[in-house]
Amino acid sequence: MEKYINNLKIKLYKNKFIILNILLSFIATIGIIGYYHIFTSYDLLSNSFINIIIFVLFTNLFNKIDWSKKQNNIFGSIFSLFLSSILILGTQLDNNSFINWNIITLIKIICLTFSIIPIIYLILSFLNKYKTKSKIINYKNVSLGTFIFIILFNIFVFLAIYPGLYGYDAGFQIFEILEKNVQLTSHFSYIFCLILANTVKLGKIMFNSYQIGFAIYCFLQMLFLSFVSTKITIYSLKRTNNIYIYLFSVLLFSVFPLYTVMALSATQDSLFAGLFALVILNILDMFENKNYWKNFINPILLSILILFACMIRNNGFYTFLVSIPFIILFKKDKKWLTLLIFLIPLILYKIYSGPVYNLIGIQNTDTMGEMLSVPSQQLARVYNYNNTVFNNKDKTLLNKYYTDVDKFTEYIFRQSISDPIKGLINNNNVSNDLSGYISLWAKIGIKDPKNYTEAFLLNTLGYWYPNKNYSDLRMYHPYIEYDMMNAKFWNKNYIDIKRSSKFKAYDKLLYLTLVKNYWKKVPIISTIFTMGTYFIVFIFLIGIAILRKKWQYFIPLSIILGLYITLFLSPVGLFRYCFPILMILPILLSLIISKNNIYLDSL
């Protein structure tokens, strides 16, 4: 009798989980239907036979979940809720430019969360079981072969878009250096402009051709980034000993068009991406290489890299500044020495951008508009969609801080770029009464948090939403530049650089992929093209670091966080600003896959 009762209890226990799995599978299926309902007819989806297949698949997936693993299940649930929110809210914003703040949206988020949970659980199970296998690899030979392979395929792109990509900033960057009567400003990196302009000038001196000079610059930049890419690839291989991660890295840096075109684009963002990646590699070397501190060159090199990264992109200073509290919190040994390694280049950068700029005669541009990009978008959205929030006093103040409030209507057409609105800021009035501006901004935000939230999310949509559609008229600019700048149209004194493709078939393929957005037509692969995917990988890595209690990795992660903060506060979500994240994507993946405290040879 007792045996019968025990068997009955076991059967009831199993039946309870069978019923739970069926219920969760049904909710997960509803989640998929609810998500795609945003794109198509609900009736069409709800009556579809495919839902039975989806339901059966979910039933099988939920059966694999071990509910006793609390940490994995808690992390999986939180991350699934986060990802579900991104997908539902991002889709609504991308399609409609607003969020449906109602119970239906909440239900969709909850249901889609259950659709994602089993997938995350399977990923976590794979990561828990994954072990880095020791292999004897001649890394010097692999490194050389990898470098040659990457260079070779990048040369094909160089020939296709010869002499390189002449973007809309490059014309002025060269012009302000070569023309003596032009006032130098801090808007662009002086060091970058100096290197670019003088390399172009060298082509004119040696070959009587600015075109060749421009080609020399782009080729040298491509060589530098190929060197960095090789170091990233070898690091990922050393850490994981995984052939698939190695192949992914090699293909990313040799044939992936977003990388190869940026490697040959005359923009400071490309150089910054290379320096940023070297900083991340150096910091990881600090944690993972026992002999790091034995070679005094390593910490000195790290300081130099941080300094040059700040000099190449002005907001690099804030990117690295974010890491300071994380060093204090999480660096166990040599904490104060590590702080000095970071603080010295940051102090030197402030000296460079202050007294040295004054000595050279560089005029510091007013950055007030850049700093207030997001607040300006938020105020403009409320002004257009909920004007009654502003009383007469508020409108008077708004007219004080902006030169022409009537032009706030431009926001309706440019909801993902702040240039039209931030260009209206009265810099003097805002600077003289910054507390008043902040007070007005906060007051309106408290009255209308809905539109403030939507304004912020729309302005940053590309950075966090993985299914973003391009091209998008709301952001005006293309996702990535490919067409050459029409220099003489903007300024008759600009140096004119024309594309003279030596590999026209490849040029046409790149044009169709990047300008006509053919990349969207390829399932799965298209996901790698969107910046939102990189953001999700980054957030997942943060969660994995917490789950594994790898607190030391929060120092390099804090630098990536610092970069994201500058991106989320920037005027528009363009790929070139996020290029550094693509560069380090193999590093992020290798940190996720390999959980062992392995020690690598110096990179």
Task: Describe the residue ranges of each PLM region.
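Start-transfer (signal-anchor) and selected internal transmembrane alpha helices
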Residues: 1-28, 49-83, 94, 98-154, ...
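Membrane-interface anchor segments at the N-terminal boundary of transmembrane helices
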Residues: 34-53, 212, 216, 459-556, ...
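Membrane-interface alpha helices of multi-pass inner-membrane proteins
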Residues: 298-313, 324-325, 343-349
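Membrane-proximal stem/loop segments at transmembrane-domain junctions that anchor or position
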Residues: 361-503
